[in-house]
Amino acid sequence: MTNMAGTATTEFRWKSPPQPPSQEQPISDSDSDSGSDSENHQHRHNDLSNSIFEAYLDCHSSSSPSSIDLAKIQSFLASSSSGAVSCLICLERIKRTDPTWSCTSSCFAVFHLFCIQSWARQCLDLQAARAVTRPSSNPTEPEAVWNCPKCRSSYQKSKIPRRYLCYCGKEEDPPADNPWILPHSCGEVCERPLSNNCGHCCLLLCHPGPCASCPKLVKAKCFCGGVEDVRRCGHKQFSCGDVCERVLDCNIHNCREICHDGECPPCRERAVYKCSCGKVKEEKDCCERVFRCEASCENMLNCGKHVCERGCHAGECGLCPYQGKRSCPCGKRFYQGLSCDVVAPLCGGTCDKVLGCGYHRCPERCHRGPCLETCRIVVTKSCRCGVTKKQVPCHQELACERKCQRVRDCARHACRRRCCDGECPPCSEICGKKLRCRNHKCQSPCHQGPCAPCPIMVTISCACGETHFEVPCGTETNQKPPRCRKLCHITPLCRHGQNQKPHKCHYGACPPCRLLCDEEYPCGHKCKLRCHGPRPPPNREFILKPTKKMLHIQAESTPGSPCPRCPEPVWRPCVGHHLAAEKRMICSDRTQFACDNLCGNPLPCGNHYCSYFCHALDIRSSSLDKRSESCEKCDLRCQKERTPRCQHPCPRRCHPEDCPPCKTLVKRSCHCGAMVHAFECIYYNTMSEKDQMKARSCRGPCHRKLPNCTHLCPEICHPGQCPLPEKCGKKVVVRCKCLTLKKEWVCQDVQAAHRATGSDPKEVPKNQFGVGLLPCDSNCKSKLQVAESVLTQRNVKEIEEKEEPSGKNASKRRKRRGRGQDIQETTRLQKLAVTTKRILMVVMLVAMLAAVSYYGYKGLLWLSDWMNEVEEQRQKSRRYPRI
């Protein structure tokens, strides 16, 4: 016991933060998803977790922090080390370098320091605004407080965080550049007082979340007090497992329950008990042994004239209530020596007892029994809002029909209460605003200011659910499932079973078995392939919000594939009669085989030999007359060369005689490409080259454009290039540069003239062909001079009209007036003629437009038909390509 006591009071030394590993095994601090970075990150997380729980495990004598008290701390550590901690206010991820504040009341949620400061100021400002707008009836109002956004725990105004402290609150601005210390932690022992007020401090390293239960050893008694044992301070309340044996409230029986916490249950021992008056006997539980029957007492009182009017009771009935000092009902007149069986007379005065309203007295004469329940005296009353005054009976409340138009404390809805006294009740509507998580709406009563953050925490867990962490609602979309160190619980279905290498918990299908199949064939060999047996049903894929349909879908196992036929090589004899008859074959192939030699027997066609591999012969003979009946039949097409030679194969099967003449149609276009000729192959190939050229001519104009001019070749369809393109004899209209003079020249002269001017006739555009070859004469010059003089006069006249001053036009106006008199006036007939001409022009224009539209539509239809015909000809030419 001395050693135990010493253990209970031992002080634990401080644990230093874990040292980084050597340079041989560097651990990356990046967020990469690669395999090495993920393993290093997981390894570092394990080191941090082990270092935080090191002192606690030393004291707790456990190999892993698996107690229920540490589950919440492990969840905080998993989310913090994986970078999944998000601020509930701004829903942004909390980085290692961000100043933070954590609630120390109940939820231990982590927020950005700036966000919680802003949140606290908004809460206090809102309360101050409410206090200003609300009529203050209580001069001693409580001090304004602000609440934690998650657990709504209250904090005083002085508790607004001003500094960035670690989780345990000992160090200001904890280091953020040490990857071997938990973010926002000082790395030292927490030493915060534990919640059960045991007097001990937390032994974990500075950590998020609540402190674990006290692991120190203390002497403690069980619930019933019968057993004393040494227990952990955090779990010192225990049950010894024996019967409680504590005396119950009846002070007769003992508790028969197993050693338990709290008060003992009521005594349930049954027996026959009498009621309080002793007239009735009933079987009751011991805890209900004192009871009253429904009969009246009816015992004679001490006066001998009245009976007891009380119900069932214990003890004496007491004195007669009518004895002693007697008075009238209102209590103003007293009667001495009046017997208890004589009724006291009425005094005849006013009752004057205070009525239920508390202001007026009973106006009736002295009477027996209670006074009026309602005061009917008419008084002048004001309604609650003070707008209406009216004379009403005293017992009646006065309320007007006016609805309060003040805005409630939510600043969104009006009060709308009838006859409000100014103290408007809080808004009863639901806020209903969309929260920042974008998934839920605010369910709080309607309020001012920002809504509280969404209180729902989303659990991100591995496939087995053993490893998990919680994130605020709205931040789960970017989260990945944690890496679980537990082994996969899915049982393999292949024949190897437990011989497989175990793998860790995962989503989706299990990795395939890597062992060899080794299943034995009937021949005695074993399958050497990778395991291809059945695979167990896979876990569902990681989905944040699976639908009900997804949850009810049951994954099915994947059936395995059968082993292939035995691939082992063995020696088998040949079924033919060639040398080297044995051949190495697959064991599973039980059929007869042929060797690599061909049969070689001549076929009936006389052109080919049997191409079968070595096969069993019905008749063996080396002579050509006695051919084997088991050899193949020649189904090949004729492969002889035709005479005369052509590219078309003989359509007949292989035959010994000569091939028939080739009747295949051969498509050949004419020289100018205007039409296509079809010839029989035998007819076309027997002609000479000169006759072929002659037969291909279409006997029509060439229709090919000459290279040096815009005219077509006038020759009959001919092969090769068009002859003498520079000797074109077509007439061309030749003009001067001003297009005044024109003449007709022969095309070859026009080409020569263009060459003389230094331009190539091939490069001259069609609309400029022959323009500028004639020299301009005197008429062209005179016309040019006349046009220039007219243009000059017109310009001078316009300039003079612009320069005429506006003030010196009186005389000119007279001249213009005189000029205007010389102009003849138009008659009605002339106006009618002009109008008729205009109408006729409009009618002609409309008719022309209609004609153009009609014939244009017809032309488009004709063009479409022509293009279809051309397309059909092209398709036919593709079917029969030119040779």
Curated annotation (Swiss-Prot):
Record membrane topology: Single-pass membrane protein
Copy out the induction comment.
Circadian-regulation with a peak of expression at or before dawn. Not regulated by biotic and abiotic stresses, by light and nutrient conditions or upon treatment with elicitors, chemicals, abscisic acid or phytohormones.
Q: What is its main location?
A: nucleus
User: Which EC numbers characterise this protein's activity in its record?
Assistant: 2.3.2.-
Q: Which GO terms describe its biological process?
A: protein ubiquitination; regulation of hydrogen peroxide metabolic process; response to salt stress; rhythmic process
> Which parts of the sequence are NF-X1-type zinc fingers?
198-216, 250-269, 303-322, 357-377, 410-429, 437-456, 494-515, 523-568, 605-636, 646-664, 709-738
Q: What happens when the gene is disrupted?
A: No obvious morphological alterations. Enhanced growth and survival under water or salt stress. Enhanced H(2)O(2) production. Elevated abscisic acid levels and reduced stomatal aperture.
| Membrane in keyword set | yes
List the expressing tissues.
Answer: Constitutively expressed in mesophyll and guard cells.
- Which stretches of sequence are listed as region Disordered? 1-44, 798-824
State the compartments where it is located: Nucleus; Membrane
ZnF region ranges: RING-type: 87-152
Q: Name one GO cellular component term.
A: membrane
* Biased composition regions of type Polar residues, renumbered to the chain: 1-10
Highest taxon listed in the record's lineage:
Eukaryota
> Broadest EC class?
transferase
Q: Give the transmembrane region(s).
A: 841-863
What pathway is this protein a component of? Protein modification; protein ubiquitination
What molecular function terms (GO) are annotated for this protein? DNA-binding transcription factor activity; transferase activity; zinc ion binding
Please indicate if the UniProt record lists Hydrolase as a keyword.
no
Keywords on this record? Biological rhythms, Membrane, Metal-binding, Nucleus, Repeat, Transferase, Transmembrane, Transmembrane helix, Ubl conjugation pathway, Zinc, Zinc-finger
Its function?
Probable transcriptional regulator. May mediate E2- or E3-dependent ubiquitination. Required to gate light sensitivity during the night. Regulates the speed of the clock by acting in the feedback loop between CCA1, LHY and APRR1/TOC1. Promotes the expression of CCA1 at night but not by days. This activational effect is enhanced by interaction with ADO1/ZTL. Association with ADO1/ZTL is not leading to the degradation of NFXL2. Confers sensitivity to osmotic stress such as high salinity. Prevents H(2)O(2) production and abscisic acid accumulation.
Notes on the domains: The RING-type zinc finger domain interacts with an ubiquitin-conjugating enzyme (E2) and facilitates ubiquitination.
How it assembles, according to the record, is: Interacts with ADO1/ZTL.
Q: Which family does it belong to?
A: Belongs to the NFX1 family.
State the name under which the record lists this protein: NF-X1-type zinc finger protein NFXL2
What lineage is this protein's organism placed in? Eukaryota, Viridiplantae, Streptophyta, Embryophyta, Tracheophyta
Q: Per UniProt, what is the name of the gene that codes for the protein in this document?
A: NFXL2
